[in-house]
Curated annotation (Swiss-Prot):
Name of encoding gene: leuA
Listed EC numbers: 2.3.3.13
Binding residue positions for Mn(2+): D13, H201, H203, N237
Annotated organism of origin: Halothermothrix orenii (strain H 168 / OCM 544 / DSM 9562)
Domain of life: Bacteria
Stored Pfam families: HCS_D2, HMGL-like, LeuA_dimer
Protein name (record): 2-isopropylmalate synthase
SMART domains assigned to the protein according to its UniProt record, in alphabetical order: LeuA_dimer (SM00917)
InterPro entries for this protein: 2-IPM_HCS-like (IPR050073), 2-isopropylmalate_synth_dimer (IPR013709), AIPM/Hcit_synth_CS (IPR002034), Aldolase_TIM (IPR013785), LeuA/HCS_post-cat (IPR054691), LeuA_allosteric_dom_sf (IPR036230), LeuA_bact_synth (IPR005671), PYR_CT (IPR000891)
């Protein structure tokens, strides 16, 4: 049985989704969960593109030791130098260099001939080799490139030292039959191809990213580049959860082994959704809310009698658990910590105490608390950053004949309490206006505001996801509570704290290209 490596690019290509911007601490939280899942490679960013990306790659490479950490670089010496500077303290760092190879890119973007592109690619791989032997080379827009040119190019860069050859469908143009044939033809026509891993990186513009990646595996590819929830530029990338579960569920057909812990999928998906602010559509394969739901009476009856009549996967395989009652107001610290550990979370003592306090508050409002609600509380604290402001007091007055008004008190770092009372178009707007008055940030715009019910019932936990734009940078805030007005205030305040504590520049530079 063969094996396929999983190369995750959520933190690089995934972050290029419109409106997504992650601070380094959030990227590290995602990287840690990817490591728990045992992906083979984590592409942590594009170091030369911004100070924030550089910092994120540096932090991740220093903290994640059991997984290869990669950084992207154009075929330019300054890009490669910057990538290595960020990676140098990692365990087994990978430099991922790329250059465009399609006629349209070479003519209009690069203004280079085929031979000039080959020379630049070879020079880049040789230059990267002075830092590490772990080098991946990508031919950007390979699916629209001339195959014979790709054969020549790949043979040369392999001789120069590349250990992985990546074949991207950069604009999502390919269909499975032709993409599979491209991989097969490359294997048959590049004389030294057996010296390297063959990787594919498919975009989803025609909804075929997963299908194209699987076609590539059938024809000899042994690395697939993916993103959690399929996020990425335009229509996104190959979805990590779909590829892994397709190979796992249909191992009888593909005869491929995977090393990933599938039970981490649900938590990873939720974490990425919370931090990016990109909600998961209910009918999304594998991780959507409806993925294991059955409305039809015939289907329900069949599943009750025998699950496999209508379910090809067990929900527990991806880490979903029955929504059973687990804890209540009489549960103590020991039981609560033990339960969190059983869920797979590794939390320091200070964070544990904060979560335990929130749990006790929730237990006073609800008789029974499910593991889903406990995980939502953990998500409130699981990714940490410095808090310039903390909510101390909130009061909202609203009604159909009353001008909505919110009174807010915030504690600052030095414990000075600042207060403001503002009106708005509704209670949430009034809360946001009051916070704005205290923090004094003029250039702040609300991009999106979402409320989701974590559980059912009148005492359900409400999850609020807020996205703001502050000085051209986008920030996402998340909070889950039974009181959605308080959750709204906390989520909004989180975006402001991220802005105030963020030291990196998030503006996209001309270096932000993709493969």
């Amino acid at each position: 049985m063969g094996e396929v490596k999983i190369f995750d690019t959520t933190l690089r290509d995934g972050e290029q989704s419109p409106g997504v911007s992650l601070i380094p601490e959030e990227k590290l939280a995602i990287a840690k969960q990817l490591a728990r899942m045992k992906v083979d490679v984590i592409e942590a960013g594009f170091p030369i593109s911004s100070p924030g990306d550089f910092e994120a790659v540096q932090i991740i490479s220093e903290n994640i030791r059991d997984v290869e950490v990669a950084a992207l670089a154009r075929s330019r010496k300054k890009d490669i130098d910057r990538a290595w500077e960020a990676l140098r303290n990692g365990g087994d760092p990978r430099i991922h260099v790329f250059i465009a190879t399609s006629p349209i890119h070479m003519k209009y973007k690069l203004k280079l001939s085929e031979e000039q592109v080959i020379e630049k690619a070879v020079e880049a791989v040789k230059y990267a080799s002075k830092y590490t032997s772990n080098i991946e080379f990508s031919a950007e827009d390979a699916s629209r490139s001339q195959p014979v040119f790709l054969y020549r190019l790949f043979e040369r860069v392999i001789n120069a030292g590349a250990k992985v050859i990546n074949i991207p469908d950069t604009v999502g143009y390919a269909i499975p039959e032709e993409f599979g044939k491209l991989i097969r033809d490359i294997k048959e026509n590049v004389s030294n191809i057996d010296k390297v891993d063959i990787s594919v990186h498919c975009h989803n513009d025609l909804g075929l990213a997963v299908a194209n990646s699987l076609a590539a595996v059938e024809n000899g590819a042994n690395q697939i580049e993916v993103a959690v929830n399929g996020i990425g530029e335009r229509a996104g990338n190959t979805a990590l959860e779909e590829i892994i579960m397709a190979l796992y569920t249909r191992k009888d057909f593909y005869n491929i082994g995977i090393n990933q812990d599938t039970t981490q999928i649900a938590r990873l998906s939720k974490l990425v959704s919370n931090l990016t602010g990109m909600t998961i559509q209910p009918n999304k394969a594998i991780v959507g809310a409806n993925a294991f739901a059955h409305e039809s009476g015939i289907h329900q009856d069949g599943v009750i009698k025998e699950r496999t009549t209508y379910e090809i996967m067990d929900a527990r395989t991806i880490g979903l658990k029955d929504n059973k009652l687990v804890l209540g107001k009489h549960s103590g610290r020991h039981a609560f910590r033990e339960f969190i550990q059983k869920l797979g979370y590794d939390i320091d003592d200070e964070t544990f105490e904060e979560i335990f306090i929130e749990f006790k508050k929730l237990a006073d409002k609800k008789k029974n608390i499910t593991h889903v609600e406990i995980e939502a509380l953990i998500d409130n604290h699981y990714h940490t950053f410095d808090k310039v402001y903390e909510l101390d007091y909130l009061s909202v007055n609203t009604g159909n004949k009353v001008l909505p008004t919110a009174t807010i008190k915030l504690k600052k770092e030095n414990n000075i309490i600042e207060k403001a009372a503002c009106s708005g178009d509704g209670p949430v707007d009034a809360i946001f206006q009051a916070i704005n008055e205290i923090v004094g940030i003029d250039d702040i715009k609300l991009i999106s505001y979402h409320i989701n019910a974590v559980t059912e019932g009148k005492d359900a936990l409400g999850e609020v996801i807020v996205k703001t734009k502050i000085e051209d940078n986008t920030y996402t805030g998340h909070s889950a509570m039974t009181d959605i007005t308080e959750a709204s205030a906390l989520a909004y305040l989180e975006t402001i704290n991220k802005f105030l504590t963020s030291e990196q520049t998030r503006q996209t530079t001309s270096a932000q290209e993709g493969i």
